[in-house]
């Protein structure tokens, strides 16, 4: 049984609606944000929507599944990913002073890189959970089947992503405490 015959689960509609409502709520809550925040969110959203459209097109060519169906499923996972980065950006703006120190921005970059690596794995794994592994076989969606069924690939991406995320968090806390103690000394 291929992806083209899977029925659209009503739970997916709820996930899509929930993802969009949360995104709009967060944007309304932070209406006073500065232009850097707006540009960051816009850029990330465009990246994720572009990625979802590209993957939808690729899988449509391979499996013959309608692009709208796949686009909506990808919007769920990528919409949640964009919300995650939105929250990370807000937390970073609140915790880091307006004069961002160079070492602190490196820590934030490492944190975001680790989260990007983890998000790719979680997004693919989430698709397997939604669709069910029984719908995948070697003749359909070869790339996704290979990623989902090859455990070493999961560890090669998830472990470095987790390590980079932890390093980013530790460095961020370390540099944050050092900057706070320097500002108190002045």
Where are these predicted regions, by residue range?
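Aromatic-rich, lipid-facing transmembrane alpha helices and their immediate juxtamembrane interface loops
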Residues: 1-184
């Amino acid at each position: 049984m291929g992806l083209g015959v899977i029925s659209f689960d009503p739970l997916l509609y709820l996930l899509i609606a929930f993802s969009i409502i949360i995104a709009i709520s967060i944007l309304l809550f932070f209406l006073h944000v500065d232009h850097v925040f707006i540009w960051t969110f816009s850029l990330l959203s465009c990246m994720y929507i572009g990625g979802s459209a590209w993957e939808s097109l690729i899988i449509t060519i391979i499996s013959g599944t309608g692009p709208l169906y796949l686009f909506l499923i990808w919007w769920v996972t990528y919409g949640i990913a964009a919300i995650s980065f939105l929250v990370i950006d807000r937390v970073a703006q609140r915790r880091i002073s307006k004069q961002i120190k160079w070492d602190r921005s490196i820590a934030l970059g490492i944190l975001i890189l680790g989260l990007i690596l983890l998000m790719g794995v979680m997004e693919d794994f989430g698709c397997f959970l939604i669709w069910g592994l029984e719908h995948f076989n070697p003749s359909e969606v070869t790339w996704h089947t290979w990623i989902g069924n090859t455990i070493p690939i999961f560890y090669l991406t998830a472990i470095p992503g987790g390590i980079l995320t932890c390093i980013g968090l530790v460095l961020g806390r370390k540099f944050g405490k050092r900057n706070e103690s320097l500002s108190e000394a002045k």
